[in-house]
């Protein structure tokens, strides 16, 4: 049995300080594909600092957290106690690796807050791996996924194929109405499903896969370059750049 944790954090950014107000995680038995533990915490020090919390990008979700805490689905606690409970859960379930979607971000959030609140970091003794690497290797590289993005208009602001957890989850579930909750536990749960989908496609637990950050659209256009009337290149290009009157063409992905 190989047991892993999938974590997610929600943060505010105050002068580049990544204060975390919501921590969620699920612990998975990858053999049975079952969740053996899940937790949702609201960080007391940030929650009670109303002015600070209101700077959060998803501050409008405060009523959701109130409802979750009243319904005992989330726990309000201090950062140090949250880290203590997390370490205890990891030990009890023999967690061997931690995963997150865009793990460098969540890893840095834990590092900052554990340093700020002077607590031990439960991630220090475990490998922290990026689910996006699996996704890059087994999902977003496929022509089926790219066609899904074309058909559903799933692009970034720069016109690249989207590879967000929301878009990937829509793809693996064939549910384009799905919207990511942007709360820590809910996001951990869908990211765990994405990870399991990658395992079903052949991904290996514990192996680090390269993250492909830019998913260029394969829009080929004809390109012919002549010098003194002689053709020196005839083919296609996929992207054109213009800088200070000079043209550059990207001919390969």
Predicted features by range, described:
Residues 67-73, 117-124, 175-181:
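Short, polar/flexible loop-turn hinges at active-site or ligand-entry regions and domain interfaces
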Residues 247-253:
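A short, solvent-exposed beta-strand micro-motif common in secreted/extracellular proteins
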Residues 105-129:
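Substrate-recognition/cap helix-loop segment adjacent to the acidic, metal-dependent catalytic center
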Residues 45-67, 132-188:
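Active-site-proximal helix-loop-helix substrate-binding element of RNase H-like nuclease domains
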Residues 230-245:
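Short, solvent-exposed S/T- and G/P-enriched segments that are highly enriched in secreted/extracellular
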Residues 94-104, 109, 114, 151-213:
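Acidic, Mg2+-coordinating catalytic module of metal-dependent nucleases/exonucleases
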Residues 220-227:
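Short, ordered, surface-exposed loop/turn motifs in non-cytosolic proteins
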Residues 2-113:
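Conserved non-catalytic scaffold segment of RNase H-like nuclease domains
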